[in-house]
Amino acid sequence: MQENRPVIALDFPEFSDVKDFLEKFDPSEKLYIKLGMELFYTAGPQVVYYVKSLGHSVFLDLKLHDIPNTVESSMRVLARLGVDMVNVHAAGGVEMMVAAKRGLEAGTPTGRQRPKLIAVTQLTSTSEEIMQNDQKIMTSLEESVINYAQKTAQAGLDGVVCSAHEVEKIKAATSKEFICLTPGIRPEGASKGDQKRVMTPKEARTIGSDYIVVGRPITQAKDPVSAYHAIKEEWNQ
């Protein structure tokens, strides 16, 4: 499946920043918004309720990683917020991921669709050197990512967060329907920031990404609405 809207990462420190940003867009335009840790820890569920009240889709990016029971109960709560997608760290293991899905299913109100559940493989800020030196995972970065993707599929999750560079091999190792959501997307000429493994929207589409996440190239642009539409157009070519 492919989401035709780029997911906008609203990595803002304050709830007011979210309101200011979304007010720039025509109310009829429904966006896909990623809300991360800093914002959720600052504003709590109210920021989710606000974004959903405007008709936008929400990916709540909290990257849960804890013992299975804690993750299960946490997912039960998150499901009640009405979000469209949530995630965990694949490093938590199959048992934890199974528990996460079970919690989501239990918490989803009757008549609503369960939020999509995906897992983080290796962060796009992680290089092979970092992985081997800091995590002591002595395989290649690609092998680690594919292993995590296979474990995620085994647990029955919907997909993974991964670099666009790994999409083709992940789908070959799992299935074409397995979701690959790719951050680290930058238009041609944009700064890479703290991302180590990046691609353009067009490259990500060509290689088979299902969702792309774009933050600063939109949120820090002089004209965020125009920047969003340009990236959306490139993504849908």
UniProtKB/Swiss-Prot annotation:
Q: Which positions bind substrate?
A: 11, 34, 61-70, 124, 186, 195, 215-216
Q: Where are the transmembrane segments?
A: none
CDD domains, A to Z:
OMP_decarboxylase_like
A Gene Ontology term for the protein's cellular component: cytosol
Keywords of this protein's UniProt record, alphabetized? Answer: Decarboxylase, Lyase, Pyrimidine biosynthesis
Gene Ontology molecular function, alphabetical: orotidine-5'-phosphate decarboxylase activity
The UniProt entry, under SMART domains, shows: OMPdecase (SM00934)
Catalysed reaction(s)?
orotidine 5'-phosphate + H(+) = UMP + CO2
Xref: Pfam families: OMPdecase (PF00215)
Q: Does the keyword Lyase apply?
A: yes
User: What metabolic or biological pathway is this protein involved in?
Assistant: Pyrimidine metabolism; UMP biosynthesis via de novo pathway; UMP from orotate: step 2/2
Q: Name one GO biological process term.
A: 'de novo' UMP biosynthetic process
EC number assigned by the record: 4.1.1.23
Q: Which residues form the active site?
A: K63 (proton donor)
What cystine linkages occur within this chain? none
Q: What does this protein do?
A: Catalyzes the decarboxylation of orotidine 5'-monophosphate (OMP) to uridine 5'-monophosphate (UMP).
* Family of the protein in this entry: Belongs to the OMP decarboxylase family. Type 1 subfamily.
Quaternary structure, per UniProt, is: Homodimer.
Instruction: Tell me what this protein is called.
Output: Orotidine 5'-phosphate decarboxylase
Q: Which organism is this protein's natural source?
A: Lactococcus lactis subsp. cremoris (strain SK11)
